[in-house]
């Protein structure tokens, strides 16, 4: 197996685009990082387990005003992320609070290490949907990629989620050349056998991924070519309003699908309607930059109307066009994936 530690990228001379008025409608979707802590240290997210990172988290009672401000600003779809959101000691209460606000969609992305004990409580609290991140079905590879994770715990968590009544769980896999790209068919068929939706992600050129993308990138076109015997020759299609993945149907059963997320080869900036909230309460209009608006003080003070105004201010800063193409290694690596949830 090839090394999975990041290697250096040649610097590109272009600077990040200047932020300007965004032409899209107001944000309808938000990803909220409730914590920047994680029990894994995946190679495309963190440089090491002991990287000197100082963890920060918005106080629990500040999240209520934050959620209300987002709702007033027009957000209809919420996804909770991390770090690892299930590490937050009050994650079930957070889900219950959001569910009571009647958002159209309430989802959570997890590494599933804590899901065996939390799947049923999360379902009872009102969580609609789950995405599970899993990059390999080989236990040793899993330990290598996550720097110590236990695959058995993750698989038990997935089983618990299915038993709790979660359906159409999405299985997210970051495909890395020489690391797990020989498992594409195994991962896809494993997900289908469990009525899950496999989604294959190109490594994104940000954070540690900025260093990995040059040597470990497998494009969606290559992934699809390798899976051609399993898939219909359809045009890949997005689910409107439900994220950037483009789906292709299975030959054996057209109700089964594979999603491809092309964060590098064919970016999706133009159709993005997503705002991100960091674990410290910063409103981030774009994953690829550190630009944003700090809403922590307004949330801590219990002023949802002020949070609402700050949401609109942050959205006005959303870049137009293809930000990825302008990323240098230095600027892209400065983005902390763990604090904004990817």
Question: What are these model-predicted stretches?
Answer:
Residues 41, 45, 140, 145, ...:
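Residues that scaffold the ATP/ADP-binding catalytic core of kinase and kinase-like folds
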Residues 60-80, 84-201:
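Radical SAM/AdoMet-radical enzyme domain recognition
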Residues 40, 139-140, 267, 293:
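Glycine-centered loop/turn positions within well-structured domains
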């Amino acid at each position: 197996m090839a090394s999975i530690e990041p290697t250096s990228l040649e610097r590109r001379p272009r600077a990040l685009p200047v932020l300007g008025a965004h032409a899209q409608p107001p944000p309808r979707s938000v990803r909220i990082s409730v914590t920047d802590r994680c029990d894994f240290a995946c190679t495309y997210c963190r440089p090491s387990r002991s990287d000197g990172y100082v963890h920060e988290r918005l106080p629990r009672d500040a999240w209520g005003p934050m959620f209300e401000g987002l709702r007033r600003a027009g957000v209809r779809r919420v996804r909770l992320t991390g770090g690892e959101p299930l590490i937050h000691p009050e994650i079930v209460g957070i889900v219950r609070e959001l569910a009571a606000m009647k958002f159209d969609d309430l989802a959570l992305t997890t590494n599933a290490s804590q899901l065996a004990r939390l799947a049923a409580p999360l379902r009872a609290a009102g969580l609609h949907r789950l995405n599970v991140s899993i990059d390999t079905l080989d236990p040793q590879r899993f330990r290598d990629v996550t720097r110590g994770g236990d695959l058995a715990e993750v698989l038990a968590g997935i089983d618990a989620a299915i038993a709790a009544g979660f359906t159409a769980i999405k299985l997210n896999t970051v495909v890395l050349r020489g690391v797990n790209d020989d498992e594409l068919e195994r991962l896809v068929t494993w997900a289908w056998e469990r009525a899950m939706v496999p989604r294959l992600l190109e490594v994104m050129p940000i954070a540690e991924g900025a260093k990995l993308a040059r040597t470990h990138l497998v494009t969606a076109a290559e992934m699809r070519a390798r899976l051609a015997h399993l898939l219909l020759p359809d045009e890949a299609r997005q689910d409107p309003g439900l994220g950037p993945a483009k789906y292709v149907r299975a030959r054996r059963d057209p109700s089964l699908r594979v999603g491809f997320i092309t964060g590098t080869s064919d970016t999706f900036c133009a159709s993005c309607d997503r705002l991100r909230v960091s674990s410290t309460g910063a409103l981030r209009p774009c994953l690829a930059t550190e630009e944003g608006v700090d809403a922590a003080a307004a949330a801590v003070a219990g002023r949802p109307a002020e949070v609402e105004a700050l949401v609109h201010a942050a959205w006005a800063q959303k870049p137009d066009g293809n930000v990825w193409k302008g990323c240098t290694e230095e600027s892209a690596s400065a983005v902390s994936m763990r604090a904004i949830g990817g």
